[in-house]
UniProtKB/Swiss-Prot annotation:
CDD domains: CHS_like (cd00831). One of its GO terms (biological process) is flavonoid biosynthetic process. It holds the Pfam family Chal_sti_synt_N. This is Chalcone synthase B. It comes from the Eukaryota. The gene is CHSB. The active site is at residue 170. It is an enzyme of class 2 (transferase).
Length: 363
């Protein structure tokens, strides 16, 4: 797929006087599996559980990748017990898609439910008022989909309007915001529940001496789910917005198809990321910002707050350097990367939640 840049112009709105018109985020909820791994000790665990301890040079290379990642810990559904029960997950090229699918189809909706319940609780309105559900995950494909299963788990109305998005990767978080904005602004009285849930079982496998990209994948990704309530027309006195979604845009950078590729195979989801990705993003992001903010007379990138998807530490560093941003601008993104790793579609929503928490503390 081509490299995709998403820009959402969000206005911090507790003090906003005019709330009618644009879609707003009314609540955010997040959830992670209870199990987590320490990034400093993960190389030992990974090479032991995959029976690869004899690959000493490869293990040291993986340790260096983990140390440079700026990730402190990651939450994972995969436990040692689960891996021992399913040893075919631990070999690089082992046929294992059925095993992965069986786990994901059951667990993804459950994790999504945890995040959704937190968002609904913060929203404070009856669950029966939800009119739309949009669900996305890169973790498994099934029919009926995770949206259908979540509808049952939450007890949503059988008439709720559902949309399921699979295999959108890191792009999906911003894409879901854009989709929710369009739905909310096109349906008076609509209350859109957005859920992004990711479990990385599909990408876990043992090391390969030929595929260094695999080591990056084993170091980078974590499991988590995020949910939001989005609507355009508030009920005075009953709902309080967190963010206003003013505009949205998406851009494809030409001739970048080879830079980032994930393919679903019998061995699970394979991962390829070229070393050029941080540079490609850094070199193209400002053009997107100019197009997004020029109508509002904004050209100082340090004058706005940032909810940046922390795809990896090198990406964050390169974009920050290219735009001349102060160190505080990506603080929320770096904190999410440190505490959770790259959560794929859910990552930008975790960052949005972290931003609003930090903003409240700073008020």
């Amino acid at each position: 797929m081509s490299t995709i840049l998403n820009v959402l112009t969000d206005t911090w709105s507790p003090r906003a006087k005019k709330l009618e018109g644009d879609a707003k985020i009314w609540a955010i909820g997040t959830a992670t599996p209870a199990n987590w791994v320490d990034q400093t000790t993960y190389p030992d665990f990974y090479f032991r559980i995959t029976n690869s301890q004899h690959l000493l040079e490869h293990k040291e290379k993986f340790r260096r990748i983990c140390n440079k990642s700026k990730i402190r810990k990651r939450h994972l559904v995969l436990t040692e017990e689960l891996l021992k029960k399913n040893p075919n997950l631990c070999t690089y090229n082992e046929t294992s898609l059925n095993t992965r699918q069986d786990i994901l189809v059951a667990e993804v909706p459950k994790l999504g439910k945890e995040a959704a319940m937190k968002a609904i609780k913060e929203w404070g309105r009856p669950i029966s008022e939800i009119t739309h559900l949009v669900f996305c995950t890169t973790s498994g494909v099934d029919m009926p989909g995770a949206d259908f299963q979540l509808t049952k788990l939450l007890g949503l109305n059988s008439s709720v309007k559902r949309l399921m998005m699979y295999q959108q990767g890191c792009n999906a978080g911003a894409a879901m915001l854009r989709l929710a904005k369009d739905l909310a602004e096109s349906n008076k009285g609509g209350r859109v529940l957005v859920v992004c849930a990711e479990i990385t079982i599909n990408i876990f496998r043992g090391p390969s001496l030929e595929q260094d990209d695999n080591l990056l994948a084993q170091c980078l990704f974590g499991d988590g789910a995020a949910a939001m309530i989005v609507a355009a027309d508030p009920r005075p006195g009953l709902e309080t917005p967190l963010f206003e979604l003013v505009s949205s845009a998406q851009t494809i950078v030409p001739n970048t198809d080879s830079h980032l590729k994930l393919h679903l195979r019998e061995m699970g989801l394979t991962f390829h990321c070229s070393k050029a990705v941080p540079s490609v993003l850094a070199e193209n992001v400002e053009d997107c910002l100019v197009k997004a903010f020029e109508p509002y007379g904004i050209s100082d990138w340090n004058s706005i707050f940032w909810v940046f998807h922390p795809g990896g530490n090198a990406i964050v560093d390169r974009v920050e350097e290219r735009l001349g941003l102060g160190p505080e601008k990506f603080r929320a993104s770096r904190d999410v990367l440190s505490e959770y790793g790259n959560l794929t579609s859910a990552c930008v929503l975790f960052t949005l939640d972290e931003m609003r928490k930090k903003s409240k503390k700073d008020e």
